[in-house]
Swiss-Prot record:
Subcellular location: Plastid, Chloroplast thylakoid membrane
EC number of this enzyme: 7.1.1.-
Enzyme class: translocase
GO MF term (any one): ubiquinone binding
Family annotation (InterPro entries): NADH_Q_OxRdtase_chain4 (IPR022997), NADH_Q_OxRdtase_chainM/4 (IPR010227), NADH_UbQ_OxRdtase (IPR003918), ND/Mrp_TM (IPR001750)
GO cellular component, as recorded: chloroplast thylakoid membrane
Protein known as: NAD(P)H-quinone oxidoreductase chain 4, chloroplastic
Catalytic activity: a plastoquinone + NADH + (n+1) H(+)(in) = a plastoquinol + NAD(+) + n H(+)(out); a plastoquinone + NADPH + (n+1) H(+)(in) = a plastoquinol + NADP(+) + n H(+)(out)
Membrane topology according to the record: Multi-pass membrane protein
Length: 501
């Protein structure tokens, strides 16, 4: 279905163009800029929702709302956009989290024009990379995303912000080199005219050796973003230093771009190599769940502890992608959406409680529950969501990944039992570090000894942000078909490539 009205182009370009108008707004304090940004974000979210409700057919696994504009003539480079069941979930998640992150960024007063412009530019890059149907365009959007994050880190971070920003840019730019090599290698192979169109590429077959080389290149690029150990070390530093609204975007969306690329490029375009590499992916995912869950209790810094819990949750996504079953891949997509909400909410709460008590190390905190009862309540609920309490979205996602790995015909019985056992140990270790974090922060008497200790509890703004993240978590936990019905046809189409041989 070719659409004559360029919905997706408007959705991708609106935030960055509207954001560049911020610099022309009158100097009337930060309030104008803040409200302008929030309005742009909400308008974008409404526009996206409208487009998906009225112009998107759920039961069609093909790409919809496609747009094709010639961009560079002699290189056959098109501005190609289109969405299918795989990208619609992350795009809506992006809109939701970015709107709430701009709402959460109210304490930022220094250089607030640049800050809000960077938030909007990041928004464009994220939606562009989720909806692009051209590999080079995907790469450009992937890179466009990188610069705002670096600046947000280096200008509004904590004490060691320059170190962590440099580490971040080195890791991700190093990964992007491999991504560029892979994109050019795929585009230039096997035909006189280079093509970068995802549709034509997904029907093309490559020699297995070349496919493996390309696969490794893409895998390195994506495992920096979706941190797969041993390439995860930028994540705790970056999260420990960034301002919490940046953290929400990092945990909620940036990590999901890696998972999306893994499914979109490695699984769709390179099926043979993926079936060779998937046992290794599963092993790495299981190791990662255990490793991050064991490293997390040793972190004194609150944000670093939450960052390691993110790394641990990403292990489930890797296992779901590696299991090559409908169930496993659906579980991975559900975990992508669910962790997008949970991770963002936890970082938001960590940041707001830091705004209240100005302590970042867990062993200095204690007794916060008496002064800040609302923060305590919401933090506890979200920790339960993160440790996969039944009725929350995390539980269902991990359960579906479990079923996916058990029902997989790819592997023998013994390895499957072993991997399931390791995953179960990881799920047991998760409550240990999360509950000890709650205990160190909220229980005890430490903050009693602070002179004139009167702390403001949650205001209406913080309550609004945290509850609007909490509602989708519970909704997905009770009725996961919200998310699964979007992607289930597309997932079947991807998996059917694997069993035609």
């Amino acid at each position: 279905m070719t659409n004559y009205f360029p919905w997706l182009t408007i959705i991708v370009l609106l935030p960055i163009f509207a954001g560049s108008l911020i610099f022309f707004l009158p100097h009337r304090g930060n309030k104008v800029i803040r409200w302008y940004t929030i309005c742009i974000c909400s308008l974008e979210l409404l526009l996206t929702t409208y487009t998906f409700c009225y112009h998107f057919q759920l039961n069609d696994p093909l790409t919809q709302l496609t747009e094709d504009y010639k961009w560079i003539n002699f290189f056959d480079f098109y501005w190609r956009l289109g969405i299918d069941g795989l990208s619609i979930g992350p795009i809506l998640l992006t809109g939701f989290i970015t709107t709430l992150a701009t709402l959460a960024a109210r304490p930022v007063t220094r250089d607030s024009r640049l800050f809000h412009f960077l938030m909007l530019a990041m928004y464009s890059g994220q939606i562009g990379s989720f909806s692009s149907r051209d590999l080079l365009l995907f790469f450009i959007m992937w890179e466009l995303e990188l610069i705002p994050v670096y600046l947000l880190l280096a200008m509004w971070g904590g004490k060691k912000r320059l170190y962590s920003a440099t580490k971040f840019i080195l890791y991700t730019a190093g990964g992007s080199i491999f991504l560029l090599i892979g994109v050019l290698g795929i585009g230039l192979y096997g035909s006189n005219e280079p093509t970068l169109n995802l549709e034509t590429l997904s029907n093309q077959s490559y020699p297995v050796a070349l496919e493996i080389i390309l696969y490794i290149g893409f895998l390195i690029a994506f495992s920096v973003k979706l941190p797969i150990i041993p390439l995860h070390t930028w994540l705790p530093d970056t999260h420990g230093e960034a301002h919490y609204s940046t953290c929400m975007l990092l945990a909620g969306i940036l990590l999901k771009m890696g998972a999306y690329g893994l499914v979109r490029i490695n699984m769709e375009l390179l099926p043979h190599a993926h079936s060779i590499f998937s046992p290794w992916l599963i092993i790495v995912g299981a190791i990662q769940i255990i490793y991050a869950a064991l490293t997390s209790p040793g972190q004194r810094n609150l944000k670093k502890r939450i960052a390691y819990s993110s790394v641990s949750h990403m292990g489930f996504i890797i296992i779901g992608i590696g299991s090559i079953t409908d169930t496993g891949l659906n579980g991975a997509i559900l975990q992508i959406i669910s962790h997008g909400f949970i991770g963002a909410a936890l970082f938001f709460l960590a940041g707001t409680s830091y705004d209240r008590i100005r302590l970042v190390y867990l062993d200095e905190m204690g007794g916060m529950a008496i002064h800040l009862p609302k923060i305590f309540t919401i933090f506890s609920i979200l920790s339960m969501a993160s440790l996969a309490l039944p009725g929350m979205s995390g539980f269902l996602a991990e359960l579906i990944v479990f079923f996916g790995i058990i029902t997989s015909h790819q592997y023998l019985l013994m390895p499957k039992i072993l991997i399931t056992f390791v995953m179960a140990i990881g799920m047991i270790l998760t409550p240990i570090y999360l509950l000890s974090m709650l205990r160190q922060m909220f229980y005890g008497y430490k903050l009693f000894n602070v002179p004139n200790s009167y702390f403001l509890d949650f205001g209406p703004r913080e309550l609004f942000v945290s509850i609007s993240i909490l509602l989708p978590i519970i909704a997905i936990g009770i009725y996961p078909d919200f998310v699964l019905s979007l992607s289930v046809d597309k997932v079947e189409a991807i998996i059917s490539n694997y069993f035609y041989q």
